[in-house]
């Protein structure tokens, strides 16, 4: 069928055919291109090309299957490339002179390490036989670099391999629809899969080798940086040692210079003393030398004179005797004078020696003074060191105190130590009703004594006190009460004695006040429903009696309609003001605490059961209804609501029954709502603030999950493997 086509093996025709097949598959929303799509694309392109030119038919129809698979791989894996690298290895005619550079570029792309894994994946997915031929070892007779990698020379082998893969994909599509492939096809696909796995293992080994080399290079760089860091640390230590050395040298230099200066002064004074001693010794030696020389000279002169005297004795005995006597006197005079002069000189030198000794003693005293000064400087240095140690101790002490202070200051932020800020405990509406009942009873007893006084009850004052102090009491902060229900056992001792004074209907209907609900077994719920039905029947009978009495009263009444309209308008205005105040208080409380749940605490004498599981809720709608009823009772607008006589009690049994009817309706609504929520089996929030908190937590958790997914995705993209 495919041999009758007129498409040639040129690249433009094949690209046009593949694009046509892809466009058809996209318009038909097909994930796999089958043979019918290829036939339809071939038919359309044939009639488009027949008008332009006539080409020879294709020899191998399997090439079309390969081209379709190549186009699919190109659009999925290589969207940024202009031409698929596999098309380079299809035909020999692509390796022409005009396309040699492009062919070489794609050849380098296929044989490079960077794109090798992508190319192998593409080849193993779309054409396993091409990968086997491309990676085959080169033959001995091949000389060209391009053919040394075992490029495909025969088109038939290529086409058969590609057609097998395309047929395998088509059979896989049929298997997904319902048909199963044959055993031979399964064996062929298994062999191809084994070949591709071996190729993938080879590529993984190459990739591991490159990764090991890169890791080793990075480790060497890290070691080099660590050595540089160590070198810088050694330089820092050297600079610190130099700084310490300079500080020590400065301190020691100042001390040594002062001590050495004083020692040099002492040595100089000692040298001066030694010089003076040497001078004294020299003067003594001179004195001794002069004495010896003079004595010897005088002796020689005496001897010469004696010889002369002896020589002349004979000749001039008489004349010489006189001369000798004269000379002897002269000699004695000269000797005495010289001896006295030398003695005076010796005494002068001795005085000089004594002066030098005194100077030496003065210098020694100066040396001792300098030594004392040195000791004083040393003591000052020790004192400065002690001061430095003291300052260091003070700094350490201040740091410890600051650390302790910060620890103490930070203790207030500890969650375990933060006390709960509990607001005042609110009052129970049942207590309010009980107080009103007692007050009315007391007032009725007072009215018996004073029949003329009609203003004893003071309903306006009671109304103000009721709504200012009791009804709108502040709500308590309990953030986790909506998760768990309370269980409590009430002993009989705690039940007040005034219980018998209340009406029987009040005790029976207090079960339904303010959303009180018993979450026990199914039998308890049925009992509550039966009691509610019985009470409904009693209330219907009483309502009929009330209607009859009201009809009688209406006949007697003849009041103008204007007064009723004015009273009605005033009542509506009061109700609107009360509702606005109530909404403002609720908004303020909800804005102050994000998860506030208004809770009215349970009264002690509501139930006496051992297992009393309940949950108390407050709803503004029911509160407004009760307030309206109380307003109507305390401030009547018609005579039928007011007492007929001063002694008549305002809080009658029928009015109580009318009031409790609203509470019974609320109890029925709560029971049905709770049963529905239990049947659904999931927690449902009871206040808008809780539902807002639940939704905010849900969106925050989803946002965190999305952030984690994006972080992991970018981490995988930045650091693959």
Curated annotation (Swiss-Prot):
Keyword annotations: ATP-binding, Chloroplast, Nucleotide-binding, Plastid
Top-level taxon of origin: Eukaryota
Subcellular locations according to the entry: Plastid, Chloroplast stroma
Protein name: Protein Ycf2
Feature: compositional bias, Basic and acidic residues: 405-417
GO cellular component terms listed in the entry, alphabetical order: chloroplast stroma
Signal peptide: none
GO terms for MF: ATP binding
Location, primary (coarse class): plastid
Positions of ATP binding: 174-181
InterPro entries: IBP_b_roll, Serralysin-like_metalloprot_C
Pfam family, one: LbR_Ice_bind
Gene: ycf2
PANTHER family: PROTEIN YCF2 (PTHR33078:SF92), PROTEIN YCF2-RELATED (PTHR33078)
Biased composition (Acidic residues): 182-404, 492-508, 516-591
Species the sequence originates in: Oenothera picensis
Family per similarity comment: Belongs to the Ycf2 family.
Function in brief: Probable ATPase of unknown function. Its presence in a non-photosynthetic plant (Epifagus virginiana) and experiments in tobacco indicate that it has an essential function which is probably not related to photosynthesis.
Region (Disordered): 176-424, 492-592
